[in-house]
Design a protein with these regions (language model features):
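Catalytic machinery of carbohydrate-active enzymes
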Residues: 1-320
Length: 320
């Protein structure tokens, strides 16, 4: 049977969060599934080794209507692409009528979807979990799993000298905006304190847009034991992260990738809902000192109220 799963939330983090549900559906169907996902999910960069997924279709819809799937003409281009695949069943993690019509026009007979027109107020994780559990008829773990070739992990271990003499920490310096990014000087101070207790190496998770932050870390006393991901693809970085002991950083894509690779994670939430860190027991949430996990959300603006001591103590606890 050819099965399609449509997951249309934006971003890498959302893609990782939905993985456990996609895997559960593939296991129920006893076959790999195709996924239709947004381009900025970057699914093609970290899911190509996933045995539960046989095809990744990227939805190319852009706000300026220049994407090949934008508008009415783009809709029917996508219909044509899906028709060629001859899918027999589709699971739609979305309440939009657009995807119902897409499936019908693509001649997919068996359509299983969120209730239509019910998007407002949906809990992203609980809605997906309930939907999947009703399909498979049993409890589904929300812990995602990202597959990386063992040979690539072993190669990275040798190349970057992952010695047991050191603790290896993936550092999530990047974020989607300045209010969600803990100050770089606080990261440095925290890890200087940690390094007095444990010899550490640091793997700096950030891209070209984070070059100033990355350079400041590298120019610090920690620089000689640091590796930057600035010029690496996600695919190149994953085997390195797989060898790490811990993730410490902002609520960013690297947090969710690290979680999916099985790392214990310390996630700093200062201006976004902590619900995005509660789907996995691997994630340990730190919030501003004047907030709780329930009150921390959009517009908390608490980056200056997460102390070095908070992060130091939590890091020390998990490293021990």
């Amino acid at each position: 049977m050819k099965v399609l799963v449509i997951q249309q939330r934006m971003g890498i983090g959302d893609m990782v969060i939905f993985l456990s549900y996609i895997h559960a559906i593939a296991k129920k169907e006893n076959c790999p599934v195709s996924i239709l996902v947004k381009e900025n999910s970057r699914a093609d960069e970290f899911l190509k080794q996933d045995k539960h997924i046989d095809k990744i279709i990227l939805l190319d819809r852009k706000r300026n209507a220049m994407g090949k799937h934008s508008g009415i003409l783009g809709f029917f281009k996508l219909v044509k692409e899906l028709k060629k695949e001859k899918y027999e069943k589709v699971y739609i993690f979305n309440s939009s009528l657009r995807y119902t019509l897409l499936a019908k026009f693509a001649h997919i007979k068996n359509i299983i979807q969120y209730p239509l027109f019910k998007k407002r107020g949906q809990n992203v994780i609980q809605t997906a979990k309930k939907f999947t559990e009703e399909i498979v008829g049993k409890t589904v773990s929300s812990q995602p799993k990202i597959f990386v070739d063992e040979k690539m992990i072993s190669k990275a271990k040798t190349k970057y000298t992952f010695s047991k003499e050191f603790k290896h920490i993936c550092v999530g310096l990047s974020a989607s905006g300045p209010t969600k990014r803990w100050d770089i000087d606080r990261f440095i101070s925290t890890f200087e304190k940690i390094s007095k207790d444990h010899p550490c190496k640091f793997y700096l998770a950030g891209g070209v847009n984070d070059s100033i932050l990355l350079q400041k870390f590298i120019n610090s006393s920690l620089g000689k034991n640091s590796v930057s991901f600035e010029n690496m693809s996600i695919r190149e970085a994953l085997p390195i992260i797989s060898n790490c002991n811990l993730y410490v950083g902002n609520d960013t894509a690297w947090l969710h990738l690290s979680c999916g690779l099985g790392l214990k994670c310390i996630a700093l939430f200062m201006d976004s809902p902590t619900i995005y860190g509660k789907y996995s027991s691997n994630i340990n949430i730190v919030v501003p000192e004047n907030q709780t996990e329930e009150t921390t959300s959009h517009n908390t603006r608490g980056k200056d109220k997460i102390s070095i001591e908070q992060v130091f103590q939590k890091t020390k606890e998990l490293l021990n």
